[in-house]
């Protein structure tokens, strides 16, 4: 496995945030059954909460998928404003964009430091780059963290990730099972992770192992459906 090093500054930030934002982690022992580089963590979004909790508390090496717009300085502000900040009623409207501009350099530094893989949604040709980078990372022994919820699947006039529970999924990520098998000759394991804000708890469930005996589309849908069902059940607990 190629060692994945995070900059000292990123490690310090994680350590500090863990101290001021403590959580419990359940199910970490389940990861011992899987090989490094075969694991795809599939986590709920919960607005910004899921990514923060997962990044801080998943107990293994991984590289996260991050929307490409979150890695481009000129696009972060508007993306985060409409995805999350617009709905934060406790914050005066006139402060929202200036606050996002203030934290943009910090976010870019963090995403670079955790070796994030850009996701080019709505750009089919560029999206293939996402899959190539992911397969390269898995070949090198790095696990992957994915947040597959669709922020746009809401009633008309509304957008953004749902605050509680699990929203509808994009299912394309599940093709990584077939791709990992075809390219790296290993079975991917899709591991559900639910971040519960109310309980301050990150729960890791049993993994769903890719089955190469199934048809490509059948297996993609099976994996995506099982993951959604598992995460939805975890949200109700």
Regions found by a protein language model. Give the residues of each.
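Soluble, non-transmembrane catalytic domains of enzymes that act on hydrophobic metabolites at membranes
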Residues: 1, 12, 16-19, 140, ...
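Helix-to-loop junction immediately C-terminal to a conserved catalytic motif
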Residues: 13-47
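Amphipathic alpha-helical segments that form well-ordered structural scaffolds
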Residues: 12-15, 106-110, 176, 226, ...
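Non-catalytic C-terminal accessory region of glycerolipid acyltransferases
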Residues: 121-237
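Structural motif corresponding to alpha-helix initiation and N-cap regions
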Residues: 25-28, 104, 128-131
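Catalytic core of membrane glycerolipid acyltransferases/transacylases, capturing the structured
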Residues: 35-121
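Structured helix-beta-strand junction loops
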Residues: 19-20, 37, 113-114, 140-141
């Amino acid at each position: 496995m190629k060692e994945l090093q995070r900059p000292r500054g990123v490690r310090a930030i994680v350590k500090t945030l863990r101290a001021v934002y403590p959580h419990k982690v359940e199910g970490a022992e389940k990861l011992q059954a899987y090989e490094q580089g075969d694991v795809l963590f599939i986590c709920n979004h919960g607005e910004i909460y899921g990514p923060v909790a997962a990044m801080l508390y998943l107990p293994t090496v991984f590289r996260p998928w991050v929307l490409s717009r979150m890695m481009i300085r000129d696009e972060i502000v508007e993306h985060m404003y409409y995805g999350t900040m617009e709905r934060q009623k406790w914050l005066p409207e006139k402060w929202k964009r200036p606050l996002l501009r203030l934290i943009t350099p910090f976010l870019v530094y963090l995403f670079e430091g955790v070796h994030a893989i850009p996701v080019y949604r709505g750009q089919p040709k560029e999206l293939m780059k996402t899959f190539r980078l992911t397969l390269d990372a898995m070949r090198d022994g790095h696990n992957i963290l994915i947040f597959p919820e669709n922020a746009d699947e809401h009633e008309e006039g509304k957008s953004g990730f749902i605050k509680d529970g699990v929203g509808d999924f994009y299912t394309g990520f599940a093709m990584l099972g077939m791709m990992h098998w075809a390219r790296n000759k290993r079975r991917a394991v899709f591991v559900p992770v639910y971040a519960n804000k109310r309980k301050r708890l990150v729960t890791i469930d049993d993994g769903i192992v890719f089955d190469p005996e199934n048809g490509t589309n059948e297996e993609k849908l099976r994996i995506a459906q099982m993951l959604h069902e598992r995460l939805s059940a975890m949200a109700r607990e």
